[in-house]
């Protein structure tokens, strides 16, 4: 049986800079997501001095902040975290949908 070739990206970035864009709304959930993101970056060898956290009011504002930050090219990777909790209104669908759409658009831009 022949071996299958496996190709992976470098999971231990050296000299890379990262930003975490996080919403302030629902901070009790978002703070745990930030902590998990920081832990993941640490486990992959990212220097703590190479990480910045940018807070925005809510999930709706995340795509705009990510877009502006990406255009500066001062970071190599951006992690976006926010929490929208489903309630009795359509607010959840609207906000989470717009956030996902905005991030998808940014991701497809060069």
Predicted regions and their residues:
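Short coil/turn connectors at secondary-structure junctions
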Residues: 15-16, 48-49, 73-76, 109-110
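Short gly/ser/thr-rich secondary-structure transition/capping motifs
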Residues: 1-5
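Arginine/glycine-rich "motif VI" loop of SF2 helicases in the C-terminal RecA-like domain
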Residues: 43-46, 104-110
